[in-house]
Amino acid sequence: MKELKNVGKNSMDTVYQLKANTSDDGSGVVFGGGTHIAFPWPVNPLGEELALVVTIDCSVLNHKIGEELFPAGKVLSVFSTYSSDRYFLDDITFHGDSEELEHISKGYSRVLLSERSDDFINENYFGPISVEVTKREVNSEDFPAFSFVSKVIPRGLIGYGVLGDEYYFVAQIYSGDIPFDDGGILGLSDATGYLFLRKRIDDFSNAGVFFIQVS
């Protein structure tokens, strides 16, 4: 995995920023709303319906950024535990402990892959928000506090070595970028979510892993 590293003040990496927008720019990315899935709306082990954080039309976004970062022809949906009634941060937090990862993998977050032709379902906590995708250069010394897609692992992400070679990094989601619950869709407005996909996806209901970290 390529990582943003401190290799000199002029070292820059290209990422594609995700920013909520009032108009649809055809990016293929949506915060919230519903999605095309061939499965029931996912619930966590406590019986709580998960929040759909972001949906990606993979081919559209691949074309937008000019590289095959996501599985072509598919729809990627990222779900995470959310509750307005209880503290849920610990259910989706991972800092490199295998027990944390095992807990999340029980269903406290889900990464689903589907076909565009699958049924459209919307049981989400908040409505759809269009997302603008913009190319941006990031200094390798910086800690990017915004949402983006990229194959470059951002500085500040820790503990991902536990994932081994089975996954690859594709996106960072900054909770404060999503205008829902004062930016608290991931527990705190400064919580950062990280999305890794499996290099080989045999099960569309288990296409990757999504977790958060809080500094």
Where do the protein language model's features map onto the residues?
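Preference for intrinsically disordered or flexible, low-complexity segments
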Residues: M1-S215
